[in-house]
Amino acid sequence: MSRIESLTRARIDRSRELASKTREKEKMKEAKDARYTNGHLFTTISVSGMTMCYACNKSITAKEALICPTCNVTIHNRCKDTLANCTKVKQKQQKAALLKNNTALQSVSLRSKTTIRERPSSAIYPSDSFRQSLLGSRRGRSSLSLAKSVSTTNIAGHFNDESPLGLRRILSQSTDSLNMRNRTLSVESLIDEAEVIYSELMSDFEMDEKDFAADSWSLAVDSSFLQQHKKEVMKQQDVIYELIQTELHHVRTLKIMTRLFRTGMLEELHLEPGVVQGLFPCVDELSDIHTRFLSQLLERRRQALCPGSTRNFVIHRLGDLLISQFSGPSAEQMCKTYSEFCSRHSKALKLYKELYARDKRFQQFIRKVTRPAVLKRHGVQECILLVTQRITKYPLLISRILQHSHGIEEERQDLTTALGLVKELLSNVDEGIYQLEKGARLQEIYNRMDPRAQTPVPGKGPFGREELLRRKLIHDGCLLWKTATGRFKDVLVLLMTDVLVFLQEKDQKYIFPTLDKPSVVSLQNLIVRDIANQEKGMFLISAAPPEMYEVHTASRDDRSTWIRVIQQSVRTCPSREDFPLIETEDEAYLRRIKMELQQKDRALVELLREKVGLFAEMTHFQAEEDGGSGMALPTLPRGLFRSESLESPRGERLLQDAIREVEGLKDLLVGPGVELLLTPREPALPLEPDSGGNTSPGVTANGEARTFNGSIELCRADSDSSQRDRNGNQLRSPQEEALQRLVNLYGLLHGLQAAVAQQDTLMEARFPEGPERREKLCRANSRDGEAGRAGAAPVAPEKQATELALLQRQHALLQEELRRCRRLGEERATEAGSLEARLRESEQARALLEREAEEARRQLAALGQTEPLPAEAPWARRPVDPRRRSLPAGDALYLSFNPPQPSRGTDRLDLPVTTRSVHRNFEDRERQELGSPEERLQDSSDPDTGSEEEGSSRLSPPHSPRDFTRMQDIPEETESRDGEAVASES
C-alpha cells in the first residue's frame, strides 16, 4: 500500500508540474501575441523626453515606449492598435505569395495539355463583374485619404485559404496602386500649392533675384567689362554685391515669415493673435526697415549701371546710404526692434516646439508649407535664427568694403563713420537685450511674490513688492545668508538700482525673510569685502543702518562677479534726492508729471528738427527755381537737437553761434565794411535818398553805396564764380554761402528755442529742491559758456548786449531767491519772538514763586518764635507752604520747558537769555536764601509760632509708625486748607 500511495503521489505531482508549465507557456504566448500586433513585434525600450510617437506625434515617456525592430517605429503602448501593418512583414508576405503563386502556376501548366493563354481567364481570374463588386466603384476608391490607406489583409480577409491566389494578387496590386496614386496626388498638390504661394510672395523681387542670381559680382557682369577694372575694384564690388544680395535674401526671409507662416497660421489654423505674435515678434517693423534699405541699395545700383547694359555696374559711393541707415531715427528703430526680437528668441523657439508637439494640424501645415525645395531651408526655426544673426553681418561686410576702398577719401571717411555707427548699434542692441531679459526676470519674480509681503525699513516705512517695479534689475542669484546663530539661509538676492533685496521662497512664493537684520540694504556707501580665509564668502557692510551681512556664493567665480557688479552699482547709485528709497503716491504723481514734461520736450525738439529740415529743402528748391541749378543741398549741423547728451550745445553757445552766423550773413550781403545801424529798439531807420533818387540804407567805409537785398553783390560775385583757394579747390559761390548761412541761422535759433524749453522744464522741476541744487544746476548749464568766454577774443557790442540780457535774467533769479530768504528770515524771527515771550512768562512765574517761598519762610520763622517744635518730630520736615506742593516749583517749571530745536540745514537761533546761566543763578540764590537743613531747623524753633499753632489746632505727635504713615497720606487739599487757616490766623 505504501508503494501504491507513493506512485499515486508522484503521478499527481508530475501532473501538477506539467499543468504549471503549460500555463506558463500559454502566458508567454499571450504576452508574445499581445506584442505582435499588425505584423509588428514590439519590445519595450527607454527613450528621451524629445522622442515623438509615430502614431499620435506626441512626446513619449520612458515607461510607455515600444519599438518595432522590423520597421523601426516607436510608439506609445496605447497606440499600438491604431498603427498600420508593418511594411517589412507586408513585403515578405507579398514575396512569399508571389513565389507560391508562380510554383502553383507551373504545376498547373505541367498537368494541363493547353497553355495558359488558351485557357479562359475565368479559370484563374474572376469575372469583371465580380471584380467590380469586390473592389467597389472608382468614386469610392478616390475618396480614400493618404492617412487612412487600405491594406490587402483587410480586403482579402473575407476569403479563406482556399481562395485563388490570383484573386489575392489582384487585390494586393489594386490596393497598392490605389494608395500610391493617392499619395502621389496629395504630395504633388501640396508642393504645387506651396510653390504657388512662394511665387506670389516673391513676385515683387523677381527681377531683382534674377539680377543677383550669380554668386559674385565677377560672375554677374560681362567678362569684357570685368577686364577693364583693377583687382582692388573687383574685390570691393564683390563685397558690395554680397551686401545687396544678402540684404535681398534677408528681406525674402522676412516676407516668408510674415506672408507665408504668419498669414497661414492666422487664416488656416485660426491660432490666437497673441500666440502668433509670440512666434514672430516685430517682424512687420523689421520688414519695413530692411525693405526700405534694400530699395535704396537697388536704386543706387540702377544709377551705377553702364549705359546700354542691365548687368554691368560699378558702385563708387555707398557710405552715405550706410550712414543714413545706421544713424538717427532709423538706428533707433533698428535698436528697439532687434532688441525685442532677439530677447524673445528662445521663447519663440520653445513655443514653436510645443505647438509642433501637441497640435497635429500645426504639423500638417508646416509640412505643407515647407514642401518646395526653396522653402526646405526656411522653416520657422531657421527663419528666426537667420533674422537674429543678420545684424551681426553688417560690421564684417562694411569693414571688408573699407579695406578694399582706395582713392576717394570722402568715401573712406563715410565708411569709417558707418562702421563706428554699426558697432555702436550692436552694443546698444546687446544692452537692450540685457535690459529686456532682466525686465522679464523682474516681472517673473514680482508675479511670484506674495502680495501681502512687506518688510520694515528703518526710518522709511514698509517696503512692499510694488517698490521692485520702480527699479531696474541689475543682477540676481541664490546665495547663502549666515544668520547671527550661525545657520545658513537660502535667499534670492536682487541687485537693483539703489538697493540689495533679500527674498526667501516659501510655498512656491517669495517673501521677505524675517531675520534679525533688514531685508533691504541701501547701496549708498555700501562696502563689499571678501572673507580672507574663505573662497566663497563675502561681507556686505551697510552704513545706514550700520549692519554687516555675511553671504556665501556657490563658487569663487560667482563671488568675484557679485563683488564686481555690486561695486559698479555703488558707484552709479543715484542720490536719495533724485531717487527716494520708498515713494509715496504724491511723489509718484510728481515723477509721472516730470516724465511727461520731458517727453513733451523731446517731441518739441523732434518737431523743430523736422521744421529745420523742411526749411532747408524749401530754400534749396527756391534757389534752384531762381536759376541755381546743380546747387548742393545745405547740410545741417549734426547733433544740434541732441540736448540730452553730455556733448549737447548749451543755450549760450547756440546764441553765440547764431550771432556769428548773422555777422557772416551781413558781411556776405552788404560787405565787411558796413556796420548795421539797426538795433532791437529801433525797428527801422529812415532811408536817405541819394543823388539818383534811390534810397540807400547803408554806406560803406569809403562812401560807396550798397543795397541790402544783395542783388548787386551777388550778381557781381556770380560773375567771379570760378574763384579758387590756394590749394586750387573750387570755392562756393556767394549764393550758396548765403543759403548755407541762412539755414544754419534758422537751425541755431530753433535749437536755442529747444534748449531754452528744456532748461525751463529742468529748472521748474528742480525748484522745490532748494537754492543749493539750483545753483549747481545753473553752474553746470553755464559751464560751456564760461569756457567759451575764457578763450574768446574781445567781446562785440552784440555779444555784450546778449551777456547783459543773461545777467539781467540771472539777477532776476537772484532777486527772487533773496525774497524767499527774507520771507524765511521773517518766519524765523516770529518764531524767536514767540519763544522769548514764553521765556518771559516763565521768568515771571518763577519770580512769583520765589516771593511766595520768601513769605512762607517768614511765616515759618514767626511760627518758630511762638512755639518751637522738637527737631526729631517727623512733621517738622513738612513743607512750609502747602501751596508749594500743588504748584510747580520755579526750577522744575523752567527745566520742563523745552524750546523747539532748529531744523536740520537751518541757522541756529541766538536767544537773548542763556538757559544755563539763568538756572545757575536761580540755584545759587535759592541756596543762599534757604540755607542748609540744619539752619532751617534752627530757625523754626520759635516758641511764639509753636504756641499759636498749639492754640489753633492742638496737634500731638504720633504714637506709632502706623499713625505716622497715616499722617503722611493726608490729601493735598486738606493740607492746603490747614495752610490757609494758619495763614488767616497769623
From Swiss-Prot:
Post-translational modification N6-acetyllysine, affected residues: 353
PTM characteristics: Phosphorylation of Ser-886 by PAK1 induces binding to protein YWHAZ, promoting its relocation to microtubules and the inhibition of its activity. Phosphorylated by AURKA and CDK1 during mitosis, which negatively regulates its activity. Phosphorylation by MAPK1 or MAPK3 increases nucleotide exchange activity. Phosphorylation by PAK4 releases GEF-H1 from the microtubules. Phosphorylated on serine, threonine and tyrosine residues in a RIPK2-dependent manner.
Coiled-coil parts of chain: 587-611, 798-867
Impact noted for substituting residue 143 to A: Abolishes phosphorylation by PAK4, self aggregation in the cytoplasm. Increases activity
Pfam assignment, any one: PH_16
Localization, UniProt: Cytoplasm, Cytoskeleton; Cytoplasm; Cell junction, Tight junction; Golgi apparatus
Outcome of substituting residue 679 to A: Reduces phosphorylation level
Residues bearing PTM Phosphothreonine: 679, 945
Disulfide-linked positions: none
Region of interest (Disordered), ranges: 683-705, 862-986
Gene induction: Up-regulated by bacterial peptidoglycans stimulation, such as muramyl dipeptide and in biopsies from inflamed mucosal areas of Crohn's disease patients.
Biased composition (Acidic residues): 941-950
Region (Interaction with DYNLT1): 131-161
Effect of residue 960 to A: Normal activity
Domain PH: 472-571
Chief place of localization: cytoplasm
Domain remark from Swiss-Prot or TrEMBL: The DH (DBL-homology) domain interacts with and promotes loading of GTP on RhoA. Promotes tyrosine phosphorylation of RIPK2. The PH domain has no affinity for phosphoinositides suggesting that it does not interact directly with membranes.
Assembly behavior: Found in a complex composed at least of ARHGEF2, NOD2 and RIPK2. Interacts with RIPK2; the interaction mediates tyrosine phosphorylation of RIPK2 by Src kinase CSK. Interacts with RIPK1 and RIPK3. Interacts with YWHAZ/14-3-3 zeta; when phosphorylated at Ser-886. Interacts with the kinases PAK4, AURKA and MAPK1. Interacts with RHOA and RAC1. Interacts with NOD1. Interacts (via the N-terminal zinc finger) with CAPN6 (via domain II). Interacts with DYNLT1.
Name of this chain's protein: Rho guanine nucleotide exchange factor 2
Taxonomic lineage: Eukaryota, Metazoa, Chordata, Craniata, Vertebrata
Gene that this polypeptide is encoded by: ARHGEF2
